[in-house]
């Protein structure tokens, strides 16, 4: 969850976006990131413009670029392009010795009179490889564009890297070497089951070498899967993608888009999961009973500060879309003081506080142009007043507030702070209309 908590906000504030292919559009954007039903922008049904480079780059040009970078060969080119496996941007889990041994194992088990093996690594470890004299000779530098490189690659070996999508359009064989499949799946997850891959998958390099030695048979065996994914992902990769995207984005011409809308009633729950007394148990039970055939549900919550808070969110019904408010209010110190202290001191009205939120585009920062039919706020006693101001500026017609008795008394000490709610109740169990 922490790895993607900014991404949804970025997507919701972006239009147009490029789907890249049907897999990315359907499985990643619409399902994995749950944009289906909430994204109001345009999701262009186009490949990435960079695929034009794979299609349009001449072999002579690409080989000249490689020669300039110190890479020369008259053999068939195999590129091993493992994905980066660091958990953080400044953390690397790669064992360079392991990487070097992998290349040696491949070379010792294939016909090196026919093939040359090169590396294309993530730039996070490229500098480390340059310190190794032997490895630096076979590592493709970044002066050679990845898609220019792919235009002349004969066999690609990868794992979970999205590089294979760019290569898929060439029709050339792809092999998947996945020595850490279980760990990677548990820590980062896979969008495509390995059994659907357009090439053989193995945890053993000797197997990969065997596939290379029998590559024509492998191509025949995996042709149905390759063709199926090609049909799904590469149909529109015709070398003219850039022109169509420029026309759609900058010239306003109509282009095919993927539909992200549904007819469900859109519910937005505002409940800061990190605050005590938020009634997590009651909310979890409610989410388990909602009629998801009728309702599209989003939970806007605070950034988890403890592991148990993250785990509690992960246990919610998977159909609940979670948006995390993980940044502080976009306001100056004096403006924040005007909100948090001024309201309680009766010196700042809710409308004055709301104006600060509007100037900072606080609502749009969190949900973009998303439209909701109902807002349900669950507010514990310790919740800061800025959540009430946020609910005030929300462009949603129907608003409900659920509070405990003690909080209700506290809230009514500031009656104008809750006057914008159409309904106030003191128990989540009273919310019956959303249940199956």
What are these regions (language model features)?
Residues 48-129, 204, 275, 279-289, ...:
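Conserved catalytic-core segment of nucleotide-activated headgroup transferases in glycan assembly
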Residues 79, 83-84, 260-276, 302-303:
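Nucleotide-activated donor-dependent transferases that construct or modify glycoconjugates
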Residues 137-143, 197-211, 322-326, 423-426:
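Short acidic-hydrophobic, aromatic-tinged amphipathic segments that line or gate anion-handling sites
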Residues 4-88, 221-229, 237, 242-243, ...:
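A nucleotide-sugar donor-handling region in carbohydrate enzymes
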Residues 25-30, 53-54, 88, 124-131, ...:
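Short, charged/polar "capping" segments at the starts of alpha-helices
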Residues 40, 45, 128-136, 162-233:
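Catalytic binding pocket for nucleotide-activated donors in carbohydrate/polymer assembly enzymes
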Residues 118, 122-165:
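Donor nucleotide-activated moiety binding/catalytic core segment of transferases
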Residues 1-56, 308-309, 329-420:
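Active-site and donor-binding regions of nucleotide-sugar-utilizing enzymes
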């Amino acid at each position: 969850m922490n790895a993607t908590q900014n991404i949804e906000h970025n997507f919701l504030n972006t239009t147009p976006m490029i789907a890249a292919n049907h897999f990315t559009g359907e499985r990643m954007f619409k399902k994995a990131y749950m944009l289906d039903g909430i994204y109001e922008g345009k999701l262009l049904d186009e490949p990435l413009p960079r695929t034009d480079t794979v299609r349009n780059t001449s072999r002579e040009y690409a080989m000249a670029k490689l020669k300039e970078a110190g890479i020369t060969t008259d053999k068939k080119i195999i590129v091993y392009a493992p994905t980066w496996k660091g958990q953080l941007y400044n953390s690397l889990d790669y064992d360079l010795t392991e990487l070097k041994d992998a290349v040696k194992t491949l070379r010792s088990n294939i016909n090196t009179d026919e093939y040359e093996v090169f590396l294309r690594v993530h730039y996070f470890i490229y500098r480390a490889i340059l310190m190794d004299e032997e490895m630096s000779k076979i590592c493709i530098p970044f002066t050679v564009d990845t898609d220019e490189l792919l235009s002349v690659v004969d066999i690609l070996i990868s794992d979970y890297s999205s590089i294979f999508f760019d290569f898929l359009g060439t029709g050339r064989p792809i092999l998947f070497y996945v020595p850490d499949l279980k760990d990677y799946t548990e820590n980062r997850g896979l969008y495509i089951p390995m059994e659907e891959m357009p090439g053989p998958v193995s945890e053993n390099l000797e197997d990969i070498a065997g596939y290379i030695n029998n590559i024509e048979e492998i191509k025949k065996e995996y042709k149905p899967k390759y063709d199926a994914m090609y049909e799904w992902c590469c149909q529109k990769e015709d070398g003219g993608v850039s022109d169509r995207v420029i026309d759609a984005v900058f010239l306003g011409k109509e282009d095919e888009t993927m539909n992200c809308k549904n007819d469900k009633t859109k519910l937005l729950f505002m409940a800061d999961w990190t605050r005590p007394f938020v009634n997590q148990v009651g909310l979890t039970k409610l989410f388990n009973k909602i009629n998801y055939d009728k309702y599209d549900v989003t939970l806007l919550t605070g950034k988890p500060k403890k592991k148990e808070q993250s785990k509690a969110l992960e246990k919610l019904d998977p159909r609940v879309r979670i948006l995390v408010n993980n940044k502080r209010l976009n306001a100056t110190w004096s403006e924040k003081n005007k909100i948090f202290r001024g309201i309680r001191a009766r010196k700042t009205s809710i409308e004055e506080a709301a104006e600060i939120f509007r100037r900072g585009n606080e609502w749009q920062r969190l949900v973009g142009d998303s439209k909701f039919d109902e807002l349900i706020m669950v507010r514990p006693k310790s919740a800061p007043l800025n959540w009430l101001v946020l609910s005030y500026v929300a462009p949603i017609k129907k608003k409900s507030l659920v509070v405990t008795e003690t909080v209700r008394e506290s809230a009514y000490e500031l009656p104008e702070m809750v006057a914008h709610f159409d309904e106030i109740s003191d128990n989540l169990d009273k919310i019956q209309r959303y249940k199956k």
